[in-house]
Swiss-Prot record:
Name of protein: 26S proteasome regulatory subunit 7
GO BP terms: ubiquitin-dependent protein catabolic process
Function in brief: Component of the 26S proteasome, a multiprotein complex involved in the ATP-dependent degradation of ubiquitinated proteins. This complex plays a key role in the maintenance of protein homeostasis by removing misfolded or damaged proteins, which could impair cellular functions, and by removing proteins whose functions are no longer required. Therefore, the proteasome participates in numerous cellular processes, including cell cycle progression, apoptosis, or DNA damage repair.
Location(s), subcellular: Cytoplasm; Nucleus
Protein family (similarity comment): Belongs to the AAA ATPase family.
Post-translational modification: Monoubiquitinated by RNF181. Phosphorylated. Dephosphorylated by UBLCP1 which impairs PSMC2 ATPase activity and disrupts 26S proteasome assembly.
Length: 433
């Protein structure tokens, strides 16, 4: 654009010869530029990352299953000749039971096996099995020709009992349980301390408590504490509901209890939680009709497993109930249930803590007075306080708001605590606990 004198203000190249030609970067310059901005250990980190990628690639090649839609290895890794030879050499085995070992101390011991519904045989061991692996009463796998013992088998356990084992840990921790600080401390003394610090009990010469009874009104956090224990401990956790052990046929419930403890003894450390134990643990009586005889047999088997002739081993037992007054005295005695923990109604501090626990996962205002709300919920259980938080969220959704206000909580208190008081069974259960 020209200025006031008419000269053009745009810059022009006066001399094309002064421009230097563009020179391409060589490999040395590129390597130098790559070093800019790198830390001291960048080269070592890069080398380790490359090694990890190579190992992952090698693992995927060896497995050849994860990246395949059919679940098969790549055809390049197939060995059909070896697979065919394996199928011809390995024949299906038959399940039998070793009833007696003859001349066990000799170099060539003999074993009496019982093939179910067929016959009994005196057999030898195959070359793959050591004599120390076979015991009397054990299930074994034998071939169909010479009936030689090829493999020891684990004890037979009902699949219903196996399904009671908790594989995935619950997502509940001790910080998610409010109003039960004293109860959690007592529970951890029984469950965690013997597993983590057994030398303390050995030095004192005492055996740690092995059984705990959790009792209290409904909704006070008994099952919630058991879920927190399952999350905390690394031991095997088995969950049993009392009504699952009530079976139709005679002896089925007692057999399930027996197999349950057999499976627990195979673990290094085990924790069994019986929920609603009053379903099978009621006091024994004779009604004249014999309707509860099977339930009483199941309870007697449970009593025998807890503290009978055979030692229990490293098995901790938790039991929860709303009606401790109905339990049999033989089940309640020390040695079977050493500690009784009462879960009473939470106090003001506990109710405030429970409100904060449930509100921290909600979108709420910052200046909500939780202590005031806790004062408006006297004699309330933790389940009722959780229902208050849920109803407060429902009031906010009904008003098409994204956050819950203190007014929503006040309306929820009026609805849950005051309007639903006629449905509450807490006063009646308080007379039983």
């Amino acid at each position: 654009m020209p200025d006031y004198l008419g000269a053009d203000q745009r810059k022009t190249k006066e001399d094309e010869k002064d421009d230097k030609p563009i020179r391409a970067l060589d490999e040395g310059d590129i390597a130098l530029l790559k070093t800019y901005g790198q830390s001291t250990y960048s080269r070592q980190i890069k080398q380790v990352e490359d090694d990890i990628q190579q190992l992952l690639k090698k693992i995927n090649e060896l497995t050849g299953i994860k990246e395949s839609d059919t679940g098969l290895a790549p055809p390049a890794l197939w060995d059909l000749a070896a697979d065919k030879q394996t199928l011809q050499s390995e024949q299906p085995l038959q399940v039998a039971r070793c009833t007696k070992i003859i001349t066990a101390d000799s170099e060539d011991p003999k074993y009496i096996i019982n093939v179910k519904q067929f016959a009994k045989f005196v057999v030898d061991l195959s070359d793959q099995v050591a004599p120390t692996d076979i015991e009397e009463g054990m299930r074994v796998g034998v071939d169909r020709n010479k009936y030689q013992i090829h493999i020891p088998l684990p004890p037979k356990i009902d699949p219903t009992v196996t399904m009671m084992q908790v594989e995935e840990k619950p997502d509940v921790t001790y910080s998610d349980v409010g109003g039960c600080k004293e109860q959690i401390e007592k529970l951890r003394e029984v469950v965690e301390t013997p597993l983590l610090h057994p030398e303390r009990f050995v030095n004192l010469g005492i055996e740690p408590p092995k059984g705990v009874l959790l009792f209290g009104p409904p909704g006070t956090g008994k099952t919630l504490c058991a879920r927190a224990v399952a999350n905390r401990t690394d031991a095997c956790f088995i969950r049993v509901i009392g009504s699952e052990l009530v079976q139709k046929y005679v002896g089925e419930g007692a057999r399930m209890v027996r197999e349950l403890f057999e499976m627990a003894r195979t673990k290094k450390a085990c924790l069994i939680f019986f929920d609603e134990i009053d379903a099978i643990g009621g006091a024994r009586f004779d009604d004249g009709a014999g309707g509860d005889n099977e339930v009483q047999r199941t309870m007697l088997e449970l009593i025998n497993q807890l503290d009978g002739f055979d030692p229990r081993g490293n098995i901790k037992v938790l039991m929860a109930t709303n009606r401790p007054d109905t339990l049999d005295p033989a089940l309640m005695r020390p040695g079977r249930l050493d500690r009784k923990i009462e879960f009473s109604l939470p106090d003001l501090e506990g109710r405030t803590h429970i409100l904060k626990i449930h509100a921290r996962s909600m979108s709420v205002e910052r200046d909500i007075r939780f202590e005031l709300l806790a004062r408006l919920c006297p004699n309330s259980t933790g389940a009722e306080i959780r229902s208050v938080c849920t109803e407060a969220g429902m009031f906010a959704i009904r008003a098409r708001r994204k956050i819950a206000t203190e007014k929503d909580f006040l309306e929820a208190v009026n609805k849950v605590i005051k309007s639903y008081a006629k449905f509450s069974a807490t006063p009646r259960y308080m007379t039983y606990n």
